[in-house]
């Protein structure tokens, strides 16, 4: 029974990783072709649906960690996926005024290259039991460029959206109300920007440690 359970787990994770891989491949293809043909102003409209699918599907990774399907710590997975879902739905989908900015292009290209590498790496490991050394190197090295460009784009887009949040009062809950609770999306977004200050260096340091560990293990093997 344990063998059957392991096979089902590997099949599920393989299908999951490759499905999301193809989602991100779509995002990158549409982003690059639209950028070259129509300019950065048209990129978001071209990638919106596959971007929403691929990024929202990542929510399952939190559940995978919680139920023990994967060994990735939820403490590392949750903030990264949470921030990306916030950008995907709370910023880009909620505030169309951001769509024509060049940072949308740098964001989706940074995200998509990162995730194409990551999901193909884990997809190969689940499907075949191994990943080639060059893919391992890409998995644990490209973040040194793509993480800063992605984070800078995230921070920039949140900042750009702030005036539109304040003017529209979207997602705000004012008192009095039956819950006796108030919420202001504008100030919550400012708080999220403040969290990036310690959070981004912490995540980058964590990924550097993971890189050192993974490449040393591969070299020893």
Curated annotation (Swiss-Prot):
Lumenal side: 33-51, 96-100, 166-184
GO biological process: fatty acid elongation; sphingolipid biosynthetic process; very long-chain fatty acid biosynthetic process
Pathway connected to this protein: Lipid metabolism; fatty acid biosynthesis
Keywords associated with the record: Developmental protein, Endoplasmic reticulum, Fatty acid biosynthesis, Fatty acid metabolism, Lipid biosynthesis, Lipid metabolism, Lyase, Membrane, Transmembrane, Transmembrane helix
UniProt-listed Pfam families: PTPLA (PF04387)
Molecular function as annotated in GO: 3-hydroxyacyl-CoA dehydratase activity; very-long-chain (3R)-3-hydroxyacyl-CoA dehydratase activity
Any Gene Ontology CC annotation: endoplasmic reticulum membrane
EC number: 4.2.1.134
Primary localization class, coarse: endoplasmic reticulum
Subcellular location(s) of the protein: Endoplasmic reticulum membrane
Transmembrane regions listed in the UniProt entry: 12-32, 52-70, 77-95, 101-121, 142-165, 185-209
Residues in the Cytoplasmic compartment per record: 1-11, 71-76, 122-141, 210-221
Domain of life of the source: Eukaryota
Reaction catalysis annotation: a very-long-chain (3R)-3-hydroxyacyl-CoA = a very-long-chain (2E)-enoyl-CoA + H2O
Stored InterPro entries: Tyr_Pase-like_PTPLA
Active-site feature positions: 147, 154
Membrane topology: Multi-pass membrane protein
Family assignment from sequence similarity: Belongs to the very long-chain fatty acids dehydratase HACD family.
Function description: Catalyzes the third of the four reactions of the long-chain fatty acids elongation cycle. This endoplasmic reticulum-bound enzymatic process, allows the addition of two carbons to the chain of long- and very long-chain fatty acids/VLCFAs per cycle. This enzyme catalyzes the dehydration of the 3-hydroxyacyl-CoA intermediate into trans-2,3-enoyl-CoA, within each cycle of fatty acid elongation. Thereby, it participates in the production of VLCFAs of different chain lengths that are involved in multiple biological processes as precursors of membrane lipids and lipid mediators.
Protein name according to UniProt: Very-long-chain (3R)-3-hydroxyacyl-CoA dehydratase PASTICCINO 2A
Organism expressing this protein natively: Oryza sativa subsp. japonica
Gene transcribed to yield this protein: PAS2A
């Amino acid at each position: 029974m344990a063998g059957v359970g392991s096979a089902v787990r590997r099949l599920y994770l393989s299908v999951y990783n490759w499905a999301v891989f193809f989602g991100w491949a779509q995002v990158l293809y549409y982003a690059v072709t639209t950028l070259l043909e129509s300019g950065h102003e048209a990129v978001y409209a071209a990638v919106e649906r596959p971007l929403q699918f691929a990024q929202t599907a990542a929510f399952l990774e939190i559940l995978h960690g919680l139920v023990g399907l994967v060994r990735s710590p939820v403490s590392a997975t949750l903030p990264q996926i949470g921030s990306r879902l916030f950008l995907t739905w709370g910023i880009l989908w909620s505030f169309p005024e951001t769509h024509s900015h060049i940072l949308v292009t740098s964001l989706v290209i940074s995200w998509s290259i990162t995730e194409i590498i990551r999901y193909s790496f884990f997809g190969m490991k689940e499907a075949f039991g191994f990943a080639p050394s060059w893919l391992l190197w890409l998995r644990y090295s490209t973040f040194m460029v793509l993480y800063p460009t992605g984070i800078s784009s995230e921070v920039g887009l949140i900042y750009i959206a702030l005036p539109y949040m304040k003017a529209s009062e979207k997602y705000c809950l004012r008192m009095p109300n039956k819950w006796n609770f108030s919420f202001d999306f504008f100030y919550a977004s400012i708080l999220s920007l403040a969290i990036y200050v310690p959070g981004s260096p912490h995540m980058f340091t964590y990924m550097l440690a993971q890189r050192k560990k993974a490449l040393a293990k591969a070299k020893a093997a």
